[in-house]
Amino acid sequence: MESMAVATDGGERPGVPAGSGLSASQRRAELRRRKLLMNSEQRINRIMGFHRPGSGAEEESQTKSKQQDSDKLNSLSVPSVSKRVVLGDSVSTGTTDQQGGVAEVKGTQLGDKLDSFIKPPECSSDVNLELRQRNRGDLTADSVQRGSRHGLEQYLSRFEEAMKLRKQLISEKPSQEDGNTTEEFDSFRIFRLVGCALLALGVRAFVCKYLSIFAPFLTLQLAYMGLYKYFPKSEKKIKTTVLTAALLLSGIPAEVINRSMDTYSKMGEVFTDLCVYFFTFIFCHELLDYWGSEVP
């Protein structure tokens, strides 16, 4: 008799249908689902920027309904679960109600937290913006000051170099105009020009019919490269021009400029040799054609 009484107290009532015991939990679950759907829809509208005309009244009504629901949930007491087991079956209605209530409370708390994160108060956003702007302003001010100092130092150093180069140019111009310092041809330079002229005569007289005229010239240039170390070297004065001054001011090292100028001078010497070689060859060719036409 006692077991039957416990069963009737903790289980279902005899006059109520079987589905009416779970109606309260189902209602709470349905309310919770609707709230989540409404919250998600509102968040999407906020993100996308859509605002309905009656959005303010709806938000106020929704906040009031949320407060009422939370009060109801707090007022509801968790049903006690009997420890007795009737006919080997555990009492499940109390546990389901308890789980539903706890899940609902957690869901409302999570929803409130998400709302607070997604829609922060205007004062906090303004404070964050001001702090970010201040930090960025400090960083930009420091970087601008450092950049201005570095740029000023670099400008002063280049200005000093430009003044030195200007003095060198001014000192070199009068000497060039007076003609006191004349460029002296070194012995190796004269030897190169004479050798190119003689080679052109020999090629026109003997080799032109059987060999290309460029092969002897290239062979002569290779021979000059080997004979260069046996001739006395003359000191070459490097002139300061506007181009070298501009290169120095642009930050290129002086060693690189000297090497490039040395390379260009060697290329100029080879080009001069080639011009002498071709001029002599063509002159000899024209003379031979003229003499051949006169002789019967």
Curated annotation (Swiss-Prot):
Pfam families: Get2_like. Keywords: Congenital disorder of glycosylation, Disulfide bond, Endoplasmic reticulum, ER-Golgi transport, Host-virus interaction, Membrane, Phosphoprotein, Transmembrane, Transmembrane helix, Transport. The modification Phosphoserine is found at S55. The chain crosses the membrane at residues 190-207, 213-231, 270-288. Residues 1-79 are annotated as: Disordered. One of its GO terms (biological process) is protein stabilization. Ubiquitous. Highest levels in brain, testis and ovary. It comes from the Eukaryota. Residues 208-212, 289-296 are lumenal. It is a multi-pass membrane protein. It is linked to Congenital disorder of glycosylation 2Z: A form of congenital disorder of glycosylation, a genetically heterogeneous group of multisystem disorders caused by a defect in glycoprotein biosynthesis and characterized by under-glycosylated serum glycoproteins. Congenital disorders of glycosylation result in a wide variety of clinical features, such as defects in the nervous system development, psychomotor retardation, dysmorphic features, hypotonia, coagulation disorders, and immunodeficiency. This is Guided entry of tail-anchored proteins factor CAMLG. It comes from Homo sapiens.
